[in-house]
Amino acid sequence: MSGPAETAAGTATPAADVVLGRFTEPTRAWFTGAFEAPTPAQLGAWDAISSGRHALVIAPTGSGKTLSSFLWALDSFVREPATEGTAATRVLYVSPLKALGVDVERNLRAPLVGITQTAAHQGRPVPRVRVGVRSGDTPAAERRRLQQDPPDILITTPESLYLMLTSQARAALAGVRTVIVDEVHAVAGTKRGAHLAVSLERLDALLDTPVQRIGLSATVEPAAEVARFLGGTQPVTVVRPASAKRWDLTVTVPVPDLTDLSSPAAAHDLGPGSSTGGLGDEGAVTGGSIWPHVEERIVDLVAERRSTLVFANSRRLAERLTGRLNEIWEARAEAAAAAEHPDAVPGFRTPDPTGFHGPAQVAGQTGTGSGTVSDFARAHHGSVSKEQRAIVEEALKTGQIRCVVATSSLELGIDMGAVDQVIQVESPPSVASGLQRVGRAGHQVGEVSRGVFFPKHRGDLVDTAVVAERMTAGRIESLRIPANPLDILAQHTVAAVAVADLDAQGWFDLVRRSAPFATLPFSAYESVLDLLAGRYPSDEFAELRPRILWDRENGTLAAGANGDILRQVATGGEFLLKTEMAAGHGGVSGRYEKWRQNAFEYAWTINKATGLEK
């Protein structure tokens, strides 16, 4: 098996004129007119991608990774314009976050419009490139439209790709040439990644020529392991130029002594393990709480900046903190208004200078608090509705809102150009997560990413200091690809046989081409098939019922209990088995009798058999 070929950090990047010379004139003219020069990450990526190689691009936030992965594919629509009546998806972009996918769709508009206008100005055929998004938020009508009239570029999630491969929608993927996996580090070390790896192999099996795979990441270690995840048995070029990203990290304790909190315990304490004193066991030595100090200081920092993104480690904390920030901001505004206008009606406050006025929030989408509507801070997490998330994201991008309190829902890759400060409450879950989160500030090439950390107690202070030090040094945790997750194998097996009968050996070979299953023993594979075929039935575990039919003699796998003839229910009529009887296998169960060791149950009672030939 070929290993990944790595372009090591510090290796000379290809000359810009040489690489740009591989693009068509409209694409080259648009890029040179829009940007001063390509970044090292872009040059390395385009060199590998234009040569037809699989590529893993590792570069800090704000290095132009999205364009590095897409531009060659966009240029292909100029080189080879789609002909009328041959609509097919050429580029498949897979994002671990729905919000990231929507963001990429928005960011593709500029190059698409620019290249199209340049081509028209030069008198060349104007490519008509359509972009579609399919995720769990996509309405059923839109999913049907995407299936019937596939877009040129499809943005989706790992789960939606899996569902497409297991339905008639897979026909829309028959023309895919390029797959881009963004934020690949977020899935490579998880079972979700193993699930995606098998989906990519199933996609290749649909095509005459395997797709070109491109992975993007800002924070990943070790690179060779992630390259193996991306390519499976195929070699991958790792593009990893020397990083010039600058960080400004500060760990802030808003009180002189964490062991002597002067503020009384607050009823709005946010600590998940809080005692009466407002702190967890690690630091509760007096009756005070750290949270009032943290909240006041966060409001101070937000007021000093254009737009701030605050990260919390749970949805509960995000909601409660959003409410408290709004309460503090509103109280300050009312106090300032009262001082400036002593004769004003009580409750009068000066309007927020940002001018952002979103729709009235509903419970569960603004953070708890006094119940008043404030334009100062908004919450963003998975429980917030799709429409509200979109409003908050757009307001944050354009600088129309001062502060957004989010969980990991805004951690990955989303372009937040207006954000100039990130605040992390409590230690981030990992060094990689910390880099991703702080990287949301200063997201443009050459800008400094500024992050402020607020530990909640002494133990958290130690964790935060260590994480911040490792972030500065770039010492990211190493990930490991899960080895042979059999539950993922079982899920994909059932899904694949629901589409068509499989050759058992061929399916084993396909699964083994994915990195997570590269060492899968055939004995373990057979055990999974035994389980799915119902070899271990139990009245106590309904999930052990047969799901597939395994013909051991012919080595085939077919749809089982959920889609097979045996699961059909006779509702007062006769169920004819004459066709199966003529096959010559004998017995009422027809051809199914020959599959010894397969356990199954009838969904009806046989009263009599008629028309049997002697």
Predicted feature locations:
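Helicase motor core with emphasis on the C-terminal RecA-like subdomain
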Residues: 14-19, 23-29, 50-56, 60, ...
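Active-site-adjacent alpha-helix of alpha/beta-hydrolase-fold enzymes
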Residues: 108, 230, 566-575
